[in-house]
A protein has these predicted regions:
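P-loop NTPase catalytic phosphate-binding loop
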Residues: 2-110, 119-185, 189-191, 276-345
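Phosphate-binding and hydrolysis-coupling loops of NTP-dependent motor/remodeling domains
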Residues: 1-6, 175-289, 300
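Amphipathic alpha-helical surface "interface" segments used
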Residues: 113-128, 259-268
Length: 345
């Protein structure tokens, strides 16, 4: 997989070759000050991943500490895009990434992911891209301290199993120990001492342009100009990509529970995107769906043919009666005059 992301100056060749990013082979670190082009680079990456003629099994997870992803978070292969306002959502992203990685390991059976890349398009092996926008904020937030060692392991061991980690950062504060796991480094406009820490060599003065920076091609450092996501008007071009995938659903997409879950809005949060009634038909008359799994959005159901009794515990005003009422209504709807005893109190 090679993605055209910009051009770089190669004076020894007297040329300006196209820079192709190879996310299957490298984790990617993107640095730069405010308005330097970091987020635009990530948007271009997302677009390039969706512009290939054959889209492989791909799952993209984004923790967006900058809050700038906007409409790009709705691209079809984006499975999650959460900000840092709710720790539970960040936990869900990590859990989803780890679960898919474990599935890859099981299916690869000791092979390297790159060595068997998409030979069978029907396989459940997926390429996972895990993006953290504003890595400095992630590292500085005490709520996420426990995730740092998990992330370090993902950075160190993930590539051979189909996981690529990408982050953006304003500077190198607290990031030095992470850099050995990121072979591809890109640095837009920032203080000169930052380039030395990132690349280990001095660089010249940059032209002050958004998207202008430095990157490494193998071990050499070159001046670089990043491409924009689209040549023409951004919104129209993004809409065109969305239309190409119209009718296709992403069964792995995670959404935030930003309202109370009900039978009416069930389909908006279910992994299957099916209505409550449709999922109930699949499970049969003896089962009652009482909600969705918080992490995978799969139906949580009680089979009353197998479970002859049920105890519901919880604090006052935390939903016990609502669950009981739902069960009663569904039993009445499915079984009519058949009696089941429900005791509340």
């Amino acid at each position: 997989m090679k993605l055209a992301m910009g051009i770089y100056d190669a004076p020894e060749k007297q040329a300006q070759p196209v820079f192709y990013l190879e996310p299957l082979k490298n984790n990617v670190a993107v640095f730069g000050g405010p308005m330097s082009g970091k987020t635009t680079f990530i948007k271009t990456l997302l677009v390039r991943l969706h512009q290939r003629e054959q889209i492989p099994n791909e799952s993209i997870y984004i923790i967006d500490f900058s809050g700038n992803m906007g409409e790009y978070s709705k691209l079809p292969n984006v499975c999650a895009c959460f900000d840092n306002s709710n720790e539970e959502n960040v936990k869900r992203v990590f859990k989803a990434v780890e679960a898919q990685l474990a599935k890859n390991v099981r299916l690869l059976k000791g092979q390297s992911f790159v060595g068997c890349e998409f030979k069978n398009q029907k396989t459940d092996i997926r390429h996972i891209i895990f993006i953290i926008e504003n890595f400095n904020s992630f590292l500085a937030d005490e709520r996420y301290d426990s995730y740092q060692e998990v992330l370090m392991k993902l950075c160190r061991d993930g590539l051979s199993k189909g996981l690529t980690v990408v982050f953006t950062a304003n500077d190198c504060s607290g990031i030095s120990r992470w850099l050995p796991n990121f072979r591809q480094k890109i640095a837009f406009d920032m203080p000169k001492e930052g380039y030395m820490e990132i690349f280990g060599s001095k660089v010249g003065d940059l032209m002050k342009l958004p998207g202008r920076g430095y990157l490494n091609v193998n071990e050499s450092v070159y001046e670089f100009q990043a491409f924009l996501p689209f040549v023409k008007e951004e919104h129209a071009s993004l809409s065109k990509i969305m239309k190409q995938f119209k009718g296709k659903t992403n069964a792995n997409r995670l959404v935030a529970f930003d309202e109370e879950l009900s039978i009416q809005n069930y389909g908006a949060y279910s992994a299957s995107s099916k209505s409550y009634e449709d999922d109930s038909l699949v499970l049969g008359d003896d089962s009652v769906i009482i909600g969705l799994d918080y992490y995978e959005h799969q139906p949580v159901a009680i089979n009353f043919d197998e479970s002859r009794s049920l105890a519901i515990y919880g604090k006052r005003q935390f939903g016990k009666t609502n669950v009981l009422r739902l069960i009663r209504n569904e039993i009445k709807k499915k079984h009519g005059k058949e009696y089941r005893f429900l005791i509340s109190g």
